[in-house]
Amino acid sequence: ASDVYKRQGMDTEHLDMIKRCYEEMYSHRPIFFLDEIQIVPHWEQFVRRLADQKYRVYVTGSNAKMLSKDIATTLGGRFMIQYVYPFSFREYLSSNGVQLDKLWIYKNRSEVVRHFDTYFRFGGLPELLVAEGQEKRQWLSSLFNKIFFGDLVARYSIRNDMALKVLIRKLAESVKQPSSFTRLANLVSSTGKKITTDTIIDYLNYLEDTWIMFSLENYASKLADKVSNKKYYFMDNGILSLFLMDPETSLLENLVAVTLKKRYGDALYFYHRNLEVDFYLDEGHKAIQVSYSLKDPETRKREVNALLKLAENVAVDDLCIITRDEEEMIVEGEKTIRVVPVWRWLLDDEG
């Protein structure tokens, strides 16, 4: 749709003309579906007129600018927002013909685990359901290039596209740790692609505006650090996997982050202050650590102690460690920590 808008040089007068032509041909009122409409200047004024005339309108787009304050003011209270994410694991299973009931852990466990291995590595974009093997990675690579050159480089008139690509790779390599603007600028510049901190800030905003990535703030930090020292995650595991040689642990945390972001939105944080907890929900009193395995004694001690120490400092009732395949209950004094494999957590918490 966006290519059509660009080629035709559309504006709101063209949209009004399409509406008039329809009304001359048909007597019943249409339902409007406007895809990637943000390409059309002042599109929100056209949509406001439709809403005032009691038309039903669906507007979709892949840029967060659609939700800016100016547009919200023009539309008034005449809209509801629905974020669309890649398939959840349950949706992915359903699309592959796997239907789960309350006893699925006994009936479908092996089938669920087999499908999860593919979902984990290639993500939940619907088009991948019809791709096989290596075709999945080729399709993901083509999709990323389309987003990179179309939604990023062309839309924002980026001249230093190689620096942007290096930044994306560095963010992928750093997906489990906070990254300050200065650190990212130094990482990119160290590859020979000189870049300023201000440009890094612009590029990060572009990546979030186009839904390639999202960020989490540190609940325990001061306001200035909340803004400048965030953790960055990719909206889909498949895109992240394109940039990693050994992706397992990063994919695990990224998948948990996407799932929690979908469920809790802006209420989701990480917690870093004298301890490191991957995900923290103040409103739900939840704390979640992500660890590929707890078999190493030092890893187990680190992950468990971080949750217990957090529980001493803030109100938290639900303590959880999400692993790749391990499951148990850890009891420490009055606190119980659930250890759950990610594929089960995805389905139990959704169901």
Region locations from a protein language model:
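Short, small-residue-biased leader/transition segments that mark boundaries at the very start
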Residues: 1-5
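Conserved ATPase-coupling elements of RecA-like P-loop NTPase cores
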Residues: 10-12, 38-47, 69-70
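Conserved P-loop NTPase "ATPase switch" module shared by AAA+ and STAND
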Residues: 26-41
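Conserved catalytic/switch belt of AAA+ P-loop NTPases
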Residues: 44-59, 73
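Interdomain motor-coupling "hinge/lid" segment immediately C-terminal to the ATP-binding subdomain
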Residues: 64, 69-178
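Accessory nucleic acid-recognition modules appended to NTPase machines
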Residues: 129, 133-287, 292
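Domain-level recognition of nuclease-like catalytic cores that cleave nucleotide substrates
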Residues: 325-351
